[in-house]
Amino acid sequence: MNIVKIEAGGKNIAVVSSSEILIEDVQSALDLMATVQYETDSNRIVINKSLLSESFFDLKTRLAGEILQKFINYRVKVAIVGDFSIYSSKSLRDFIYESNNGNDIFFLATEQQAIDKLSMLK
């Protein structure tokens, strides 16, 4: 895992990359949050969707809700970057739409969009 700390808009943003899946369950999400907080002192994280288990995008597993609720509970804002058009589930599209209209969780196409979005939040 590689974590790069970026300052944008006066905010510290952690951009996490890896060649393997980092979030497979709630505990691995909590571990990632703790590592990022410790290494970067940031509560804003950008991750590529490839770092998430595919079961995250199957809402029937409830994994997305459980994981994202932890981010919200710990006041960590996260932007997930990737091409989400490959998923045909209307429920997932609605979930992404609602998340993008909130203040904590975002699904965006590019890393730069993610950094820009997280830097504009309070």
Model-predicted segments: where are they?
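Amphipathic, Lys/Arg-enriched alpha-helical "gate/interface" segment within cytosolic domains
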Residues: 2-122
